Amino acid sequence: MNPVSPRSLTLIGAGLAGCLLAILLSRRGWQITVYERRGDPRIKGYECGRSINLALAERGRHALRQAGAEEVVMAKAVMMRGRMVHPLVGEPQLQRYGRDDSEVIWSIHRAALNVALLDLAEQAGARVHFYRRLHTVDFDAGYARFIDDRDDQPHEIHFQSLIGSDGAGSALRAAMQRKSPLGERTEFLDHSYKELEIPPLPGGGFRIEGNALHIWPRGRYMFIALPNDGGTFTVTLFLPNAGEPSFATTRNGDEAFALFARDFPDALPLIPQLKQHWEEHPPGLLGTLTLDRWHLDGRALLIGDAAHAMVPFHGQGMNCAFEDCVALADQLDAHDDLASAFAAFEAARRDDAGAIQQMALENYLEMRDRVDDPEFLLQRQLEQQLQARWPTRFVPHYTMVTFLRTRYSIALARSEIQREILVEATRGHSDLSRLDWAALETIVHARLEPLDGAH
């Protein structure tokens, strides 16, 4: 058994959120121990099973700055200026995310980011133990047992408090549920995803525009590609589970080849190993996790995907989890006891987590159905015009979520108002030439207060 120090926390999961939290708290003087069920990715390679690239936004970068990790991480990131939309017929068109290159997002490979944060966590003083799968927790006695799956050997510890940063399939959440039900609910989409890869050119470099997120929208399904710093693209097909086409009708490499030849013809030559990768990579599930509570007084707390997993369509899962880490560190600074800190953390983050979960689902519909829709494109034009005229009041949804650190719940509420304005103002119009700008000014000033941080 390991003795427990007065300011010690035990983290379950050495993924992205676990490592960042370990850095933040170690630098504040906490004794941090992290237990990870997998092996050390620096020795045996990354085995997460998910290589969906991550979109790093201002929220995530702010958290990295607080941990002194931004410079190391950004050296591995690739700038994305916007969505490059590939229609079935016609040339690809870039839809910028922001006004200029000061408003971009960054693509980074999950494995590279995890390894960088793991190094920094250990440098900050955190102790990380690999091959430790959480097996049993006695919350009353402060006792936990881990199993090394290589030899089935148990490892037992005493703890002051457990923090679950172990993802959507959280073992700590399951243990907490057995102690006291958390009201867990998971709503799965009727779509799944499959990951593939676009290799670099023979001499290096990208085969398609490297500073964009590429989307092939096809109504009920879509294909996306995010750049890596080595010239590759991590590409993901989102497809229904049933119907035509679907994973039920695309069962092998030959059927996948036929699907791409029909629906993504310009992408087909970019993926030489399509058939092989299709058969090697299993489909992944997509779901939204909600809980009635995230903590057991001061004995255990869930953060990130372990508390509020979301679908990946707003690129905010990691950014939200990183915000969790900073918020938790701040609450631990502000409170003398863990129970109060955990309760304050949950109170501060619950509404925002629910808001971004909702916005992520809505963004899926936008990405697959609307990015090539004329009405949507006209609304985007008007959105840009309104921002240019009243930049502190009419702040685009994407700007609030991605380039600012506006609370997600506030961004959601303002976005709903702004969507109503855009839909009503463009109804019956094919362009912006006949809009009543004086009336729009009155509406914008009446319905939207100036937003902190907007400029």
UniProtKB/Swiss-Prot annotation:
Question: Quick one: which pathway?
Answer: Cofactor biosynthesis; NAD(+) biosynthesis; quinolinate from L-kynurenine: step 1/3
Catalytically driven reaction(s):
L-kynurenine + NADPH + O2 + H(+) = 3-hydroxy-L-kynurenine + NADP(+) + H2O
Q: Which UniProt keywords apply?
A: FAD, Flavoprotein, Monooxygenase, NADP, Oxidoreductase, Pyridine nucleotide biosynthesis
Q: Name one GO biological process term.
A: NAD biosynthetic process
- State the gene name recorded for this protein: kmo
Instruction: Say what the protein does.
Output: Catalyzes the hydroxylation of L-kynurenine (L-Kyn) to form 3-hydroxy-L-kynurenine (L-3OHKyn). Required for synthesis of quinolinic acid.
Per the record, the similarity remark reads: Belongs to the aromatic-ring hydroxylase family. KMO subfamily.
Q: Which EC number(s) does the record attach to this protein?
A: 1.14.13.9
Give the enzyme's main class according to its UniProt record, as a single word.
oxidoreductase
The protein, known as: Kynurenine 3-monooxygenase
Q: Which domain of life is it from?
A: Bacteria
Which cofactor is recorded for it? Answer: FAD
Q: Molecular function terms in GO for this entry?
A: FAD binding; kynurenine 3-monooxygenase activity
